[in-house]
Structure formats: structure tokens, C-alpha cells
Amino acid sequence: MIADDTGVEIDALGGEPGIKVRRWKGYKMTDEEIIHYCLERMKDVPEGQRGAQFRTVLAIIQNDSPVKYFDGILRGEILTNPLPARREGMPFWPIFYLPNLKMTLGQFHDQPMEFQVANPTHRELAVLSALPYLRSLHTALM
């Protein structure tokens, strides 16, 4: 069995919100509420100290074996204002900036597939880190 979850960890907020993005304030928030709440909490955090990361954790369990965990991390920064590239259900896409690519996560997902494949995100990185283990399971079954 394979399961995964993803969270956003903001350095200046001690790793908040983690996997509780949607219920960060204790109730189910809209995308706009999440963006506003994040930017309000970060309003006094100076540039250069606005680091954050998306973290995906894959959990793999087979039969009675212990659970194996695999991380994928995508580092970036939280902008002071959201950019227009938005997608319903992805509140951090317009404010999560990827300095090495000079674009937000929302802009990244608008790029051609070849570009996206060449620049794996947290989800792809988690899967890539699990591949050797998955291959070993396949070999053991053969």
C-alpha cells in the first residue's frame, strides 16, 4: 500500500501550517482566506527570511514489513503579494516563489510539460526517492 500527504512548512512560522493548510485557523478556510492569513502572519518578515518548503511524504507498507517513508522537498520563498497564476484548491501557488526558476509554483505549472519534467516538484522528488525501494520489492517478487 502507498499513501502520501503534502504540507507547506514556513520557516519564519516554525514550520506552520504543515499538513493543516486548509484548517490552519481551526476551521475550513477558502483559498483566499489562506493567502490573506499567510501574508498577514508574514507581514513583518523581511525578504531573505521568508523561506518555505513544500514537503511530500510517501508511506509504503508491504505485508508485515515496517512502514518505509520517503520525502520530497521543494524549497522556495513566500512572496509579499500574490501573483495572478492561481488554481482552485492550491492556495500557495500564487505566493510560493521558486527563486532558481524565477517564477511562482502557479507559473511553473503553466509551463510546457518538458520544462516541468526537467524540474521535479516535491511530489516527483518523493516518488523518485522511493524508486530504489520499489524496484527492490519488484525484484524480490520475481
Question: Where are the model-predicted features located?
Answer:
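Anionic-ligand binding patches
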Residues: 1-142
